[in-house]
Amino acid sequence: MTSPSTIKQKFIAKGHQLGVVAVGFSDGQPNQGVDPSGLIEAGLLDQLRDDLEYDIRHDGKVHTYAEFVPEHDPNHRGMKKPRTVSAATQQLSRQVYEHAREGRLVLTLGGDHSIAIGTISGTAKAIRERLGREMAVIWVDAHADINRPEDSDSGNIHGMPLAFLTGLAKDDNEDMFGWLQPDNLISPRKLVYIGLRDVDRAEKRLLKEHGIKAFSMHDIDKYGIGRVVEMALAHIGQDTPIHLSFDVDALDPQWAPSTGTPVRGGLTLREGDFIAESIHETGSLVAMDLVEVNPTLETLGASETIRAGCSLVRSALGDTLL
């Protein structure tokens, strides 16, 4: 039987409280159906409450932010639906900020990975205000998602969140991410990738130019997942709050087929769980995103993908094998 974690959380004032935001937003990419309802219906929040004994603070809604969508949203700098994504992520940023400011651990269930513009900006601001320090981001994904608008071939904003969050991409228009302020941003030095295997040429150049720490599947094959996680955490340092943003497509499609941009040669489910377990064991986790679960794609694999997503979240929040 699962029991609550005994790991003391260093940066969470209300360690028993879990702020949950469910986000059914998919306009950062072309596929509809990126929605956390399957995770919730599979009992994820019940498991976190009953087995891990979290006091769940959730409004019971899956937010689509449809009320914030403008009537007209033409492309801007090559970005598709920029005003829609900006408005949705600004609202999400406020929601995450409210939870994090209260000292709660925050779990956001997506939603495509563009929502990280909202989640990370909200957490970063709250951590600066509450603790007076910068946080780190561990981004577990097959993709780097750090394209600047002008570098993106697709124009889909789910491939750009880290460009905006690090300040490598900016826009002065309030309706198109101009609302992002310095206290919403993270330093490229505090960003670590794990699991990369489909990185655009312009993104590779940015990673090198800015000295961003990135561990690809080549590194995992070479060193093993244990050593890679050790190196990632050593880069961040022991006294740094961590926001974990986990794209389910980091897993090999064998384990998570129901996602919009699957790439073969990825993490096993155990490797994904190990990353999440190890971050929990640091006692430094302040927020987690799980994104890009889309049960409408590869419907025969939907239940497998949902089970994998639930496992990743439980592992990050203190579930153990023994």
Swiss-Prot record:
It catalyses: L-arginine + H2O = urea + L-ornithine. The keyword Metal-binding applies. GO terms for biological process: arginine catabolic process to ornithine; urea cycle. One of its GO terms (cellular component) is nucleus. Mn(2+) 1 binds at H113, D141, D145, D247. Its EC number is 3.5.3.1. Mn(2+) 2 binds at D141, H143, D247, D249. Pfam families: Arginase. Coiled coil: none annotated. Substrate binds at H143, A144, D145, I146, N147, S154, G155, N156, D200, T261, E292. Keywords: Arginine metabolism, Hydrolase, Manganese, Metal-binding. One of its GO terms (molecular function) is manganese ion binding. InterPro entries: Arginase (IPR014033), Ureohydrolase (IPR006035), Ureohydrolase_dom_sf (IPR023696), Ureohydrolase_Mn_BS (IPR020855). The keyword Metal-binding applies. NCBIfam families: rocF_arginase. Belongs to the arginase family. Homotrimer. This is Arginase. It comes from Coccidioides immitis (strain RS) (Valley fever fungus).
